Design a protein with these regions (language model features):
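Bacterial N-terminal signal peptides that target proteins for export
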Residues: 1-8
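Hydrophobic helical h-region of N-terminal Sec-dependent signal peptides
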Residues: 8-17
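Intrinsically disordered, low-complexity polar regions and short flexible loop motifs
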Residues: 23-228
Length: 228
């Protein structure tokens, strides 16, 4: 995954020859990210996801505390040192997390019924490497839903036919407007409209709730600034 400011800016540079000398509004700011500090060599990227109905305060490593829950499901990806354990704080209580591989992106899923339990670790790799595409990643975190499904609204094309409970799947897409629904069995969520994604963007779609009352929410993925 290429979520940190430097790879994202490099993806924009790959598009620059197509644009000639004209620069759309806001592009100068994006290209300026090239000059932002890079994460240290050997870094890994970790975020925490809360699929529950109650918000919790969470911090990863040296990152700032963030509130995650129904309004915002996941934290930003925090930068941690790969190959070494790191600290996680949930509702003010610190805990040590096992090491993660350098260069990897991971999502740690809280158990909303028991936040003190070990977190489910999901690897967020294996997505698109095409700089001309955006990436969407679908997480099946609905209770009692052995196979989650994501499709275009109004009985449109199926995007992910069967994502196992407690797992995710990703694919590259052309940045287009779309309305998506998710569900389990014969039940579907309310539709969610994709935002105006740019090439190189990564967008998460979370299926929460239950098999009988599925909820679909989306969130643009991002990383903490270097040094936070």
């Amino acid at each position: 995954m290429k979520l940190s400011p430097i790879p994202f800016a490099l993806a924009l540079l790959a598009l620059a020859p197509l644009a000639g000398h004209a620069q759309p509004a806001g592009q100068e700011g994006r290209l300026a990210q090239l000059y932002a500090p890079r994460p240290p060599a050997g870094s890994a990227f970790v975020r925490v996801l809360n699929p529950g109905s109650a918000a919790l305060k969470v911090a990863v490593g040296n990152g700032a505390e963030q509130s995650i829950g129904p309004a915002t499901r996941a934290t930003r990806y925090a930068i941690v040192e790969g190959g070494k354990p790191f600290t996680l704080r949930v509702a003010g209580t610190p805990r040590s997390q096992p090491k993660v591989v350098a260069g990897s992106f991971s999502t740690l899923v809280l158990d909303p019924a028991a936040p003190s339990k070990p977190l489910l670790a999901l690897a967020d790799g294996g997505g698109t490497s095409d700089a001309l595409k955006a990436e969407i990643r679908f997480y099946n975190l609905a209770s009692g839903c052995p196979q989650g499904r994501l499709a275009m609204a109004n009985k449109g094309a199926v995007v992910f036919p069967a994502v196992a409970a407690g797992s995710s799947s990703a694919r590259g897409i052309n940045p287009v407007k779309a309305r998506l629904v998710a569900g389990c069995g014969g039940k579907e969520s309310a539709p969610v409209a994709l935002p105006a994604l740019q090439p190189g963007d990564h967008y998460s779609l979370f299926l929460t709730g239950s098999a009988t009352a599925p909820i679909l929410q989306g969130q643009l993925s991002g990383t903490d600034a270097v040094g936070r």
